[in-house]
Design a protein with these regions (language model features):
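Active-site region of glycoside hydrolase catalytic domains
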Residues: 25-27, 37-402
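Catalytic domains of carbohydrate-active enzymes, especially glycoside hydrolases
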Residues: 1-18, 228-234
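General structural concept
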Residues: 14-15, 35-38
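Glycine-rich, proline-tolerant flexible connector loops at the mouths of alpha/beta enzymes
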Residues: 17-31
Length: 402
């Protein structure tokens, strides 16, 4: 697969390291040498082809041992264990890795409770479950800040960023209440990245927690840790947009990336209801850069579609080429017209893989077709889609030949 990425001309490849591959039990004193060897082999292969790795330390894979013993990230013990793991990664892989992300879609704690936070509601009969979510998120914020600080100490030339789900909502109407509701909704998208960029809880998040009657426990050094561990860049996933309204009564909803919104009558929808919107990417880039004044990195963007192998043995996917073309143009405008500092882009998928949003193989994203069905049956052979050659041309021309 890496050789195929090199054929496309990849300059960067996003990957993640599985915590449990490095420490089979997070409380082990010594890392798993076979796990370290596995990732070293991957990184060396990327280096052979001059592909820069972008490495995520935690991507929806909280070790089960932490869920069982500490109730996931609700237990503060997870901070020290994560830092031990992160330190091991920096020490063993730092020679090959310049760009790091601490947590994938860090805002996902309140959506993907188990995979992102290791939180199981049945384990919490002594504290309101929602309060436990805020506390778990605080522990991840502290862990992220400590990882940034330690990463810079071990790998002085490294760039360590955060990663968020870039949900984008337009007000459904120009009614003031719809605009206010949308503003409040977008605040909830940014609240945790605000901490990672500015090094402190935003006032609106403090008020949100207070107004719910919850208390998030801080240790005495937490505020200083957050201040000292701000990120170098902001990365995000972007797929589509939706609308938002103060009331959805009588309105048609559309599914989206983890959240439903109000359907936008001006946008096309995929088979799965996601409303594709290249202008929304430019809008998001400007919004993010104006807010954070940090370099931006798009680390997930793509189109899920039901690809078919034709009688000629090929996969013709002009719809993916069109999606890519439109989004590259949006990035170009954000850079050249709006002055956004966009430092990188990675397509979601590269090869076909199981769709996280629908749990199926049929929703395919890759430039490379993988012969597997929804039940794991198939030859696992790879086929270059038409979009493979198209993306190769995009990379070679730095987006000028579309």
């Amino acid at each position: 697969d890496i050789a195929l990425f090199a054929q496309m001309g990849f300059k960067v490849y996003r990957m993640s390291i599985c915590w449990s591959r490095i420490y089979t039990n997070p409380e082990d004193k010594v890392p798993n040498e076979k796990g370290i060897e596995f990732y070293l082999n991957v990184l060396k292969e990327l280096k052979k082809y001059d592909i820069e790795p972008l490495v995520t330390l935690s991507h929806y894979d909280v070790p089960v041992a932490l869920i069982n013993k500490y109730r996931g990230w609700y237990g503060r013990e997870c901070i020290d264990l994560f830092i031990k793991y992160a330190r091991t990664c920096f020490e063993h892989f730092g020679k090959y890795v310049k760009y790091w992300l601490t947590f994938n879609e860090v805002d996902a704690m309140l959506r993907h409770l188990v995979t992102s936070g290791g939180l199981i509601e049945d384990q919490f009969d002594d504290v309101p479950f929602e309060q436990a979510m805020y506390q778990a998120m605080h522990h991840q914020m502290v862990a992220s800040a400590l990882a940034v600080k330690i990463g810079h100490e071990i790998c002085p030339d490294s760039q360590i960023g955060c990663m968020m789900t870039k949900l984008c909502f337009y007000p459904f109407t120009c009614k003031p209440e719809d605009n206010l509701a949308t503003q409040q909704r977008m605040r909830s998208v940014y609240r945790y990245v605000d901490i990672q960029v500015f090094g402190e809880y935003p006032i609106y998040l403090k008020k949100e927690i207070d107004n719910k009657g919850f208390e998030v426990h801080f240790e005495k050094d937490d505020e200083e840790i957050l201040k000292e561990g701000t990120v170098d860049f902001v990365s995000f996933s972007y797929y589509m947009t939706s609308c938002w309204a103060a009331s959805t009564e009588g309105l048609e909803l559309s599914p989206g990336n983890t959240f439903n919104g109000v359907k936008n009558p001006y946008l096309p929808s995929s088979e799965w209801g996601w409303q594709t919107d290249a202008s929304g990417l430019r809008y998001s880039l400007v919004e993010l850069y104006d807010r954070f004044r940090k370099p931006l990195f798009i680390v997930e963007n793509g189109l899920g579609a039901r690809d078919v192998v034709s009688e000629d043995g090929k996969v013709h996917d002009p719809y993916r080429e069109d999606y890519l073309k439109e989004h590259v143009c949006a990035m170009s405008d954000a850079i050249n017209l709006d002055g956004v500092n966009l430092i990188g882009y990675t397509w979601w998928g590269c090869i076909d893989l199981i769709s996280e949003s629908t749990r199926e193989m049929s929703k395919r994203y890759g430039f490379i077709y993988v012969d597997i069905d929804d039940y794991g049956n198939g030859t696992y052979n790879r086929i270059k889609k038409d979009s493979f050659e198209f993306y190769k041309k995009v990379i070679a021309s730095n987006g000028t030949e579309l």
